[in-house]
């Protein structure tokens, strides 16, 4: 009968070993999750660095290519100025739109911070942990006296068994039974209580996310719109005419600028000699070839510029896709954080309800224990006094009566011992259950606190990375926009200078043609007014009018 309590006392050891094994497995799983989160954070950092480097390289390459192409462009017309003004207005609108988008995102981030601040009731969690610690201390104070009482009951049972064995060994000495009940001293040396094991709570390191980030760059470099008829004044004729017809039409058009006092020859009369006419035709062909080469060069430059624009647009699309992926990852992480917080809150509510139930159960057991102690003390005192009176009144006078008395005493002791063992076993089982429930509750609270701490650290890291990414994106956008505006300003200045030079050149060429035609008309009028052939020859022997320099020299 004494071996049963010892076996029951050894039962919590395998349970504690199983609990340690489960805690070690849970700790290893948490470490694996931490390692995975750290690896994911490293990959996110690498992806962000690669995206930033590729973006900077792409922007630098596009800027270099645009500068090289813009430096080599020629023959820009006046109509491009209005188109670039509209493009600048569109860029300003895009900048305003980007500023509005950034303000909306900042408002969303502030709302998210408010939600996170509401979802982290740190003060209430600390109060609940302190309350749980106080409840565990109260349970320990209740369990220790119960264990002491159980130890005292065990000692009493052992003394009763020893007394019965002594009575069995000495059946022939009836006087030795007198006052046998006085040999039952009560031992008040309680056995040392078993302290509940404390479970370590592991702290997990911070984890990331990534990245994410929001980069709405717009890199659109417009192609130059080159018109054909406005820049080549007095150098080209209407389409569909031969070079000879173009030269004739140009001379006819300049004839309108001749003063009315000059005599006009009849139609069909040859105004220019054949050599000069051929020379003018050769010059016209050369100018036309140069114009065609300039057009081809312009088309090639436009194609190269369009290709560079397409490449830049593709690179910007790739960067935008990466930013969207990082934002999606951030949103998923925020969703998981919110779900984990809701789950933690539900588990805390369940633990609070279970804690209340356990406290009520402990109170009930305490009341039962007090009632049992109150019942046992009067019954034992009454039984002892009755036995003393019976033994004093009627002592056995024969061996048979002595045997009957011993048998009756043994049955009473056995029944009392069984009742006490059953009661002690029931109390021990309830104590073990309460201790296990308390340990589970403590472990659950520790794990929930660790998860909450990890989620809070991950949220802080993600918020910091999001802020840094947004700041970097805004800086890159401002630098890119500033570079675009600087390039556009330099292009507009260069275009204005080229257009001014072309306008002056075209006006000078027109004036030279007018002077040349006037000089030819004057020479022809002199020949027509000559009286003799010698005068005509002298006029023809003068310096030929092949260039405007001949007019200035003459």
Curated annotation (Swiss-Prot):
One of its GO terms (molecular function) is GTPase activator activity. This is Rab GTPase-binding effector protein 2. Belongs to the rabaptin family. It comes from the Eukaryota. One of its GO terms (biological process) is endocytosis. It is found in: Cytoplasm; Early endosome; Cytoplasm, Cytoskeleton, Microtubule organizing center, Centrosome; Cytoplasm, Cytoskeleton, Cilium basal body. The gene is Rabep2. Residues 15-173, 274-512 form a coiled coil. Plays a role in membrane trafficking and in homotypic early endosome fusion. Participates in arteriogenesis by regulating vascular endothelial growth factor receptor 2/VEGFR2 cell surface expression and endosomal trafficking. By interacting with SDCCAG8, localizes to centrosomes and plays a critical role in ciliogenesis. SUPFAM superfamilies: G protein-binding domain. Heterodimer with RABGEF1. The dimer binds RAB5A that has been activated by GTP-binding. Interacts with SDCCAG8; this interaction is important for ciliogenesis regulation. Interacts with RAB4A; this interaction may mediate VEGFR2 cell surface expression. Keywords: Cell projection, Cilium biogenesis/degradation, Coiled coil, Cytoplasm, Cytoskeleton, Endocytosis, Endosome, Phosphoprotein, Protein transport, Transport. The modification Phosphoserine is found at residues 176, 180, 187, 191. It holds the Pfam family Rab5-bind. Residues 16-29 have a biased composition (Basic and acidic residues). Residues 377-386 have a biased composition (Polar residues). Its main location: cytoplasm. Residues 1-15 have a biased composition (Low complexity). Residues 1-29, 167-250, 375-395 are annotated as: Disordered. GO terms for cellular component: centrosome; ciliary basal body; early endosome; intracellular membrane-bounded organelle.
